[in-house]
Design a protein with these regions (language model features):
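N-terminal pre-Walker A segment at the start of P-loop NTPase domains
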Residues: 1-16
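Conserved catalytic cores of phosphodiester-cleaving nucleases, focusing on short active-site segments
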Residues: 340, 365-384, 403
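Accessory nucleic acid-recognition modules appended to NTPase machines
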Residues: 195-364, 369
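Domain-level recognition of nuclease-like catalytic cores that cleave nucleotide substrates
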Residues: 411-448
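Short glycine-rich substrate-engagement loop in P-loop NTPases that contacts/grips substrate
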Residues: 54-85
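Conserved lysine of the Walker
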Residues: 33
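Hydrophobic positions on the alpha1 helix immediately C-terminal to the Walker A/P-loop
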Residues: 36, 40
Length: 448
């Protein structure tokens, strides 16, 4: 099944740029990188695909140094003519050859007319070993699981997509979009699983797909363990992480006897691979956003569908009407972060939450989001506006009057006031509009 991915537009811009550079497409395993590039290849007259897990395909990079000789060897290997233009060369599984990664820069320096894209599984580890490229020689894009809008496009629900992109949101579409978003919240955005679900419309059929994905990730990380002890630790971390509470501590993680340093190293490996991100807080209420890595982080999973499967929640979720109140709000927080991550394709975006920088009292705001010169606080919870105590503490010290709450409710803007009397504007936004936060922040500030 071919999906409509928003990253495709970025690929078209890259193709049209007369000064394009070799492109590395980054992202976790099984998010659809190879499928997307094969779709994109139809924009070219000539397409050559290499898989460096194959000995025949990796040999030119391993045995030759001159980039023009490498290219001639590829043409010979693939039985391809030597086209002058409109050629896309796709180097898949490039993590298998550090030398091939280093050679990418020479396509730009010596063969700038060629379009070259590289991708791979656990590519982040290989890139880390290779080190940085000279500035301006390589471009990067990031592909994520399907977001809610891409899920709707896959279901060919164009009316829902139109409503989702209407600002402000039309009142008649609320019920329908909530139901569709709850469906997406159960399934998640992994392409193989979404394709299976759309074809059969049967959640029960998906368990084997989820389990296979989890096992693939576990097996992948075993490759990066230097001994059996590290292998066991990585497997423990990836299996235990879904069960952890909102914020984690490396010390005694999962009630284990592993040392804080060992757990931290393992979690940073998972973060590097994009499977489980470490999300750190800021204590700032104004720009710049400076995260504090000494404070306890949250864990953000690659995909909410995988998390639901790991926690065996999908059956319960079939009857849920308000995700704010389900599983202590963990699933909706994960999902909103996933939506925000997915709209950032040009760099590795991580959500940030806020904590008060005082030991005498604790306060947390679920998200802060940069808009121009403002840091907008965002809560992901229901309840009366007057009971949002952490948000009140943020608004008491920030330099603007705008706050947002994502919940299972209709869109409205209310005049609010903190306990100490600070007045502010609160935008109540349906949580299915999380990916549209940039548009709604602009609309909110522009109209209120």
């Amino acid at each position: 099944m071919n999906f409509k991915r928003f990253l495709y537009a970025d690929l078209l811009k890259w193709k049209a740029n007369t000064k394009h550079k070799p492109l590395i497409l980054r992202g976790a395993r099984q998010v659809g990188k190879t499928t997307l590039i094969r779709q994109f290849a139809k924009e070219f007259d000539h397409f050559i695909e290499l898989n460096l897990e194959l000995k025949s395909d990796i040999t030119p990079f391993q045995e030759l140094d001159d980039i023009e000789q490498i290219l001639n060897a590829i043409y010979l290997l693939k039985g391809s003519p030597k086209p002058k233009q409109q050629t896309l060369i796709f180097i898949d599984e490039i993590q298998e050859s550090a030398k091939a990664i280093k050679q990418l820069r020479y396509f730009y320096e010596k063969l700038p007319n060629l379009h070259v894209i590289a991708a791979g599984s656990l590519l982040e580890f290989a890139l880390q070993k290779v080190g940085s490229f000279p500035v301006g020689r390589i471009e990067y894009l990031y592909l994520h699981p399907l977001n809610f809008e891409e899920f709707l496009l896959a279901k060919e629900n164009n009316n829902a997509v139109e409503a989702l992109n209407t600002v402000p949101f039309p009142k008649f579409a609320y019920s329908t979009l909530f139901n569709l978003f709850h469906e997406y919240a159960i399934i998640g955005g992994m392409p193989e699983i979404v394709a299976n679900y759309i074809e059969h419309n049967n959640i029960a059929r998906l368990a084997s797909n989820y389990n296979a994905l989890w096992e693939t990730y576990k097996d992948d990380f075993a490759k990066y363990a230097s001994n059996n002890t590290e292998k066991q630790l990585l497997r423990f971390i990836i299996e235990q992480a879904p069960n952890e509470a909102d914020r984690i501590s490396f010390e005694k993680f999962g009630n284990s006897v592993y040392r804080s340093r060992e757990v931290g190293e393992a979690l940073r490996l998972l973060d590097l691979a994009g499977i489980q991100l470490l999300i750190y807080p800021t204590t700032n209420t104004a720009l710049p956003i400076q995260v504090n890595v000494k404070k306890r982080p949250r864990l953000q999973f690659l995909d909410v569908g995988l998390l639901n499967e790991a926690l065996s929640l999908q059956g319960e979720m079939l009857t849920i009407t308000n995700l704010n109140d389900f599983y202590r709000g963990k699933i909706i927080s994960q999902l909103i972060n996933q939506e925000l991550i997915a709209i950032h394709n040009s760099y590795k975006y991580k959500p940030v939450f806020w904590v008060r920088d005082k030991k005498t009292s604790s306060a947390e705001v679920d998200l802060v989001y940069k808009h121009k010169q403002m840091l907008i606080p965002i809560e992901i919870k229901s309840g009366a506006a007057g009971k949002l105590k952490s948000l009140h503490q943020f608004m008491n010290v920030c330099e603007h009057p705008y706050a947002i709450r994502l919940l299972a409710n209709k869109l409205e803007v209310i005049d609010a006031k903190t306990i100490s009397g600070t007045k502010f504007k609160l935008l109540n936004l349906p949580y299915f509009l999380a990916a549209k936060l940039p548009e709604y922040i602009k609309w909110f500030i522009g109209n209120y």
